[in-house]
């Protein structure tokens, strides 16, 4: 009886009941190759779905029916594409897709009007959809370690963006529209091919406290001659005033959180 009771407690039906009760499905490191059918049966009750570190290659179209989901984590899988139906997840706040094989994102991504964090580092993206500019509530965008050669001009529409990470790509130009990101606090573009930044970036992005551009062709002289550099440097020093002394902050080889001395 005890054995049968144990099996019953972990039956698909009982799991669905439990997941509906909590709103949370956590299946990390479960050796899954597909998204279990029971997950989709949770329906409108599902708020958090974590499928980190499995071997899932495909996200089913039915994921679009999970309309109350707020957090979707699929990091460390084998996903190659995102279904257009993801655009139905209007309550989604956090989407984590790091360490997959994704080469393109659907334009429907821009329909995620409540999205606050999008992390899709270590994939194979060659471009971002134009609709990324429709994500006006997004606070964090991480597209590091992809194959991007540019950021879309539409990124200037991400009016709430506070942190942009795009390290380890092949980006050559930063669009002038980035100057519209008045909430931007941190911009990290290490390991790209950037030779210059929009002239008004430091002047217009008055919240900016941290720029990291190591391993790029841009020179320290170019950076220091940008409009608004003095004010930016004052903000940066104020941020670290109580944490790091000036000898560490300004080393002999680089401006920490800045640009290599070429």
From Swiss-Prot:
InterPro entries: Leu-rich_rpt (IPR001611), Leu-rich_rpt_typical-subtyp (IPR003591), LRR_dom_sf (IPR032675), LRR_domain-containing (IPR050216), LRR_R13L4/SHOC2-like (IPR055414)
Pfam families: LRR_1, LRR_14
Domain of life: Eukaryota
UniProt LRR repeat ranges: 19-42, 43-66, 68-89, 90-112, 113-135, 137-158, 159-181, 182-204, 206-231
Disruption phenotype: No visible phenotype.
Signal peptide location: none
Distribution of this protein across tissues and organs: Widely expressed and preferentially in leaf sheathes.
Keywords carried by this UniProt record: Leucine-rich repeat, Repeat
Biological processes, Gene Ontology terms: intracellular signal transduction
Function text: Leucine-rich repeat protein that likely mediates protein interactions, possibly in the context of signal transduction.
Family the UniProt entry places it in: Belongs to the SHOC2 family.
Protein name: Plant intracellular Ras-group-related LRR protein 7
Upper taxonomic lineage: Eukaryota, Viridiplantae, Streptophyta, Embryophyta, Tracheophyta
Gene name of the record: IRL7
């Amino acid at each position: 009886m005890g054995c049968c009771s144990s099996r019953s407690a972990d039956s698909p039906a009982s799991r669905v009941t439990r997941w509906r009760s909590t709103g949370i499905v956590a299946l990390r490191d479960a050796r899954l190759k597909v998204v279990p059918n029971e997950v989709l049966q949770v329906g409108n009750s599902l708020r958090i779905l974590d499928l980190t570190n499995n071997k899932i290659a495909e996200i089913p179209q039915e994921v679009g029916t999970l309309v109350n989901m707020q957090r979707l984590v699929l990091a460390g899988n084998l996903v190659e594409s995102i279904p257009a139906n993801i655009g139905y997840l209007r309550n989604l706040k956090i989407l984590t897709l790091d360490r997959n094989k994704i080469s393109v994102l659907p334009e429907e991504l821009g329909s995620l009007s409540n999205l606050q964090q999008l992390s899709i580092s270590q994939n194979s993206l060659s471009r971002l959809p134009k609709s990324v500019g429709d994500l006006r509530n997004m606070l964090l965008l991480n597209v590091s370690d992809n194959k991007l050669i540019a950021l879309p001009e539409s990124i200037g529409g991400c009016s709430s963006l506070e942190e942009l990470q795009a390290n380890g790509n092949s980006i050559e130009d930063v669009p002038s529209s980035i100057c519209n990101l008045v909430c931007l606090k941190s911009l990290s573009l290490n390991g790209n091919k950037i030779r210059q930044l929009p002239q008004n970036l430091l002047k217009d992005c008055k919240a900016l406290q941290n720029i990291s551009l190591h391993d790029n062709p841009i020179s320290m002289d170019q950076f220091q001659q940008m409009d608004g550099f003095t004010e930016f440097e004052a903000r940066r020093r104020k941020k670290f005033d109580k944490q790091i002394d000036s000898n560490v902050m300004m080393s002999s080889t680089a401006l920490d959180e800045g640009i290599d001395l070429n």
